[in-house]
């Protein structure tokens, strides 16, 4: 018999097989990299009995009503019962589809199955390759409120040096993509997170419809081959991955202090999910037992002293504490206010201290060491309150004991609690202690189409100088020191939307901003 001819593999098929092999190599190497970034955790301590969850009435989601349709316009006979029933069934099916679209997805999700569709995100798991080796009223676009003249006129040498360094951060412009800056998610950016690795900037973005984008900003543009010498070769888009991990807005990211592979995300779909970068799987870390219970989660944080505990706030004015080693039904949930909590944070060095910001126009400090009351009245001890003229959007603790808030009275307020480590459990703070040390005029009127401006501290600054970032309605990102002095106003050519969601890398002087188009601005 004549020898069989080997099948000819097309260039496309060869490239596809190479991509599959590369993805497998990338994912298999992430665990090794994670061990280099963060050592293996100590053996788990004996499980302690968790406190019973306070009983409360769950909020039920309203069933979507079918859209009314005209029988006459649909050409149905008024007496045709069969056709009427058919129309009713079709309406019910559409209503069920609308309801299912906003229901959270339970169970484990493989990233390969929830990839966001679209040319910009067709790289899929390739985007995880970056983890290998781990004051006018209203906006005035382009008008600076902090200029080079402010830097030059600084008389204090230390402050001037810091201002020069922060103002010297350059806008990331490696990729000449349309619109100048990479698009991480399809819809408006609502949350950002920097992976804590210092080897390269890796940014996570969450949008208003539940998509999570991942981008490794260290990748270099690769010029595509071009056979025509008369025309310039096209530069391919950067590798960006986006996955539909939630069904509603992703409000917050948090990175495990002991596992470099673990990324936690929270959403208005009432769930907290853990993304395992090694396995490429998103698992449910917390969700109400009743799938119809609506518990929109506005923020999450984790105490540095206990990586198995996660704290979360909700739009229903509650604060929750959940041990990740136990079932969601064992979580403690406390009612703190009748109005929504827009943001909260834990003191990085004293994680039993919680600062909450609420629609009830208050900043409140709570102590998790002392839980008091019974039944629905059970809650952490309230240490102090400060009232603002309008609602407070976010409260952010620094590692040195400052709290920065943004509010709709167009103020950034900085509170100073240097002796927080000496507070006894449940000890009340005086009115004088709760007064802000500094108030900074700042336009916080975002309107409907811009994500709410929230201050975010650099968690562990290398230089030991506490500083935070916040979006600016004039299409900049502002950088402030703990004493309220402005250090920089970051901008650049081609920024056509407000980088409302601003984030500092935990240790490096890298600043990210996300806008309403799903695009990223990055200063390094």
UniProtKB/Swiss-Prot annotation:
The keyword Transmembrane helix does not apply. One of its GO terms (molecular function) is DNA binding. It holds the Pfam family WD40. WD repeats lie at residues 184-225, 245-285, 295-332, 336-376, 385-425, 447-490, 493-524. Keywords: DNA damage, DNA-binding, Repeat, WD repeat. Residues 35-79 are annotated as: Disordered. SMART domains: WD40. One of its GO terms (cellular component) is nucleus. GO terms for biological process: DNA damage response; regulation of DNA damage checkpoint. Residues 54-65 have a biased composition (Basic and acidic residues). InterPro entries: WD40/YVTN_repeat-like_dom_sf, WD40_repeat_dom_sf, WD40_rpt, WD_repeat_DNA-damage-binding. Gene3D superfamilies: YVTN repeat-like/Quinoprotein amine dehydrogenase (2.130.10.10). The keyword Hydrolase does not apply. DNA-binding protein that binds to both single- and double-stranded DNA. Binds preferentially to UV-damaged DNA. May be involved in DNA-metabolic processes. Belongs to the WD repeat DDB2/WDR76 family. PANTHER family: WD REPEAT-CONTAINING PROTEIN 76. This is DNA damage-binding protein CMR1. It comes from Chaetomium globosum (strain ATCC 6205 / CBS 148.51 / DSM 1962 / NBRC 6347 / NRRL 1970) (Soil fungus).
